[in-house]
């Protein structure tokens, strides 16, 4: 039976039991000693593919650990699960949908059927539409109501309609095309719209309203605010189509808003929001970096798809990263995972991976609705490299929690300044090294003694300078961030998340927890504005409503 129809209790599998026994045997494992004993540990636990180099040697593992983890992947039927996803089986069981974001980066000649219909022609038809629109805007042929060319594009969307496109647009800023500036509007906070619109001219601004359903509250409120602003700045309803386009599966609602049908880019229900940057949701990416680079992004993701489907599990980047996450989360008690990019342009990758991982694997029931028997997705957090060293890295080094980390760093900078990049790269490596090595009590005392400190003071200070070490991390190195390598990097994390969901037996492609807050929000809003007099379901919420109503002006 398919894994998504008959979820397993992973804790009852022989492979899981073997890993528990192995975990007990690894209690005293020292990475420092492992490196000292094996001069080829780095070569054994590293690999290269799709323009990415992964060093996973600084982990609490040996070859037996890897073999046992791969055995777990085999026992849960991972190979069949991968085939199920790529072939279009309905693996999103709770919503009755296939999961085919990977189709968006497949070559035009491929065939893939959904409900008996080959979807690849439609996928490439939309890609051609994107190419045509981007060309018209970049060539100055798409003009606003005053016949001036478009200079600014504002993407209005939230969640997956925002985080992925923003990440890629900023990560590939060195590839930005001249003449058009791209902006993002996500939050319903009016201050965000105010600050953005203050620097725009309505006559040269194009808004992209990105919402699969075209009823996402934050997106529609911001779209309405943008339309009101556009009209107040001199635009007309008759010319609205020149300044508003949509990415949505709800064509009727977009037309009712004022878009022309030919300016509405479709979405499919087999593409989830957090996996949608490869679709027309990626239109602002194509506008920012050009369609040639956008297609390179897709191509890079496709190469990772191929690697994921064909590489043996012990040499498969997404699978190995997923298995390491299971190892720490389920056998070492880790509750969080840090993403630490040492690259200014990648500063938003943590936000995208937060949604990708936490919205996908933040689940507590199996595919059949029964409770899980073990912990699932971790908290994903982090931030840009050296800044974090002077903020939260302290907790990574000397805190009481085990928090595995991924370091991401390019070899070449787009903007070399003196020896800055050498120092940046050195900092990245030294942080992973420090997490692994730590500092013993003897080393701390010797260091203080060499500075001439007396023994009484050494005895007092040395315990504070001891760093446990043995903290695991992965290091992902790219020669230079490019569309192709970035596509591979993002796709790698997508597949990592999927692998973990298969092992835990959960559905990575729904997000029912998000819906409850939306439902309750309507009632809270009605009570805030006085259109609903009934009290809230609890005293705390009602008290906060009363506090707002007693003080709010405007």
From Swiss-Prot:
Membrane-spanning intervals of the chain: none
Chief place of localization: cytoplasm
Any one GO biological process: glucose 6-phosphate metabolic process
Enzyme kind, highest EC tier: isomerase
Domain of life of the native organism: Bacteria
Reactions catalysed according to its record: alpha-D-glucose 6-phosphate = beta-D-fructose 6-phosphate
GO molecular function list: carbohydrate derivative binding; glucose-6-phosphate isomerase activity; monosaccharide binding
The keyword Flavoprotein belongs to this UniProt entry's keyword annotation: no
Gene Ontology CC annotations of this record: cytosol
UniProt function note: Catalyzes the reversible isomerization of glucose-6-phosphate to fructose-6-phosphate.
UniProt-recorded name of the protein: Glucose-6-phosphate isomerase
Annotated source species: Pseudomonas entomophila (strain L48)
Gene assigned in the entry: pgi
């Amino acid at each position: 039976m398919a894994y998504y129809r008959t979820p397993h209790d992973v804790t009852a599998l022989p492979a899981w039991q073997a890993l528990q026994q192995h975990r007990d045997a690894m209690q005293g494992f020292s990475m420092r000693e492992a490196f000292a004993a094996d001069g080829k540990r780095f070569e054994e636990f590293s690999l290269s593919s799709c323009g990415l180099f992964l060093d996973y040697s600084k982990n609490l593992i040996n070859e037996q650990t890897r073999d046992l983890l791969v055995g777990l992947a085999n026992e849960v039927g991972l190979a069949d699960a991968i085939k199920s996803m790529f072939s279009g089986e309905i693996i999103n069981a709770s919503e009755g949908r296939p999961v085919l974001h990977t189709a968006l980066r497949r070559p035009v000649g491929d065939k893939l059927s959904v409900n008996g219909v080959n979807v690849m022609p439609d996928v490439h038809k939309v890609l051609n539409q994107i190419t045509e629109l981007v060309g018209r805007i970049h060539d100055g042929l798409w003009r606003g109501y005053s016949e001036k060319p478009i200079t600014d594009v504002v993407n209005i969307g939230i969640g997956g309609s925002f985080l992925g496109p923003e990440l890629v647009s900023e990560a590939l800023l060195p590839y930005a095309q001249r003449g058009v500036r791209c902006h993002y509007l996500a939050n319903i906070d009016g201050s965000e719209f105010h600050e953005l619109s203050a620097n725009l001219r309505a006559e040269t601004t194009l808004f992209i309203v990105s919402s699969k359903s075209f009823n996402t509250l934050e997106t529609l409120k911001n779209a309405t605010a943008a339309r009101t602003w556009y009209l107040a700045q001199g635009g007309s309803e008759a010319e609205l189509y020149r300044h508003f386009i949509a990415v949505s599966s709800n064509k009727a609602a977009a037309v009712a808003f004022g878009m022309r049908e030919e300016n509405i880019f479709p979405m499919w229900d087999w593409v989830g929001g957090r996996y949608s940057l490869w679709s027309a949701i990626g239109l602002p990416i194509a506008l920012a970096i050009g369609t040639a680079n956008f297609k390179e992004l897709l191509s890079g993701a496709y190469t990772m798809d191929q690697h994921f489907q064909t590489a043996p599990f012990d040499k498969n980047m997404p699978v190995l990263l997923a298995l390491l996450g299971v190892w720490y989360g389920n056998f070492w008690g880790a509750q969080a995972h840090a993403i630490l990019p040492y690259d200014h342009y990648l500063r938003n990758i943590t936000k995208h991976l937060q949604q990708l991982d936490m919205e996908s694997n933040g689940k507590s029931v199996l595919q059949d609705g029964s409770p899980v028997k073990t912990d699932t997705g971790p908290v994903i957090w982090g931030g840009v490299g050296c800044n974090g060293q002077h903020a939260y890295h302290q907790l990574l080094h000397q805190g009481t929690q085990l928090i595995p980390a991924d370091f991401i760093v390019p070899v070449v900078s787009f903007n070399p300044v003196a020896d800055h990049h050498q120092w940046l790269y050195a900092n990245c490596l030294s942080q992973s090294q420090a997490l692994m090595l730590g500092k013993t009590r003897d080393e701390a005392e010797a260091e203080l003694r060499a500075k001439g400190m007396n023994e009484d003071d050494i005895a007092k200070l040395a315990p504070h300078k001891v760093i446990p070490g043995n903290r695991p991390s992965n290091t992902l190195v790219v020669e230079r961030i490019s569309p192709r390598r970035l596509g591979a990097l993002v796709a790698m994390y997508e597949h990592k998340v999927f692998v973990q969901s298969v092992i835990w037996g959960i559905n990575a492609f729904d997000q029912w927890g998000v819906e409850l807050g939306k439902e309750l929000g309507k009632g809270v809003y009605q009570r805030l504005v006085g259109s609903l007099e009934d009290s809230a379901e609890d005293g705390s919420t009602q008290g906060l409503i009363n506090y707002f109503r007693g003080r709010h002006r405007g």
